[in-house]
Amino acid sequence: MSKVLILKSSILGGYSQSAVLIDHLASHWENQGAAITVRDLGGKDVLPMVDGEIASGLRGGAELSARQQEMLALSDTLVAELKANDTIVIAAPMYNFTIPAQLKNWIDFIARAGVTFTYTETGSKGLVEGKRAVLVTTRGGAHKDGPTDHVVPYLKTVLAFIGITNVEVVYAEALNMGPEAHDKGMSEAKHSIDLLTA
């Protein structure tokens, strides 16, 4: 049975368009028998902002404060969750041309030297290999393949850095450019999901 980790990152709750698409995707895979874990980074599973104390603690060590120990344990949980699943689905709405801070927090918690990547004499090497990732990205405007899209290139870079290079992308564009454009963007995205999950 396939195991899927879904990361929601919208802060819009019931108004989230990325959540609508993620739920559409999840229903397909659930019907196919996949085991799905959902982490709502913009809602009930929001993570603490990584500050200097937390970042230092994530490097480990013998003399960690109670807060650092707690955050290191949280990071270990998130990394184990990432490694335990075959497919990682990331809901990535575009906020001011980039990803939500809540999703960036998750990245900061799981991107750890010696744990999800390592450095060699020839550069970095990802340690989370053999996985598939699906990015579901929603935007108010039209940014696909253009210089204003800092969502997909960034996430592909992060995923490749930790070893995940099999990445598929579902775009929902122009969602704030009028009712017709919204409906067209959502319809095309759902069609892409239908093909991806068939």
From Swiss-Prot:
Entry's EC annotation: 1.6.5.-, 1.7.1.17
Reaction(s) this enzyme catalyzes, per UniProt: 2 a quinone + NADH + H(+) = 2 a 1,4-benzosemiquinone + NAD(+); N,N-dimethyl-1,4-phenylenediamine + anthranilate + 2 NAD(+) = 2-(4-dimethylaminophenyl)diazenylbenzoate + 2 NADH + 2 H(+)
The protein, known as: FMN-dependent NADH:quinone oxidoreductase
InterPro entries: Flavodoxin_fold, Flavoprotein-like_sf, FMN-dep_NADH:Q_OxRdtase_AzoR1, NADH:quinone_OxRdtase_FMN_depd
Function: Quinone reductase that provides resistance to thiol-specific stress caused by electrophilic quinones.
Required cofactor names: FMN
Domain of life: Bacteria
Pfam short name (any one): Flavodoxin_2
Quaternary structure annotation from Swiss-Prot or TrEMBL: Homodimer.
Cofactor binding comment, as recorded: Binds 1 FMN per subunit.
Source organism: Shewanella sp. (strain W3-18-1)
Gene from which the chain derives: azoR
Similarity section: Belongs to the azoreductase type 1 family.
A molecular function (GO) term: electron transfer activity
HAMAP family linked to this entry: Azoreductase_type1
Binding site for FMN: 10, 16-18, 94-97, 138-141
Assigned keywords, A-Z: Flavoprotein, FMN, NAD, Oxidoreductase
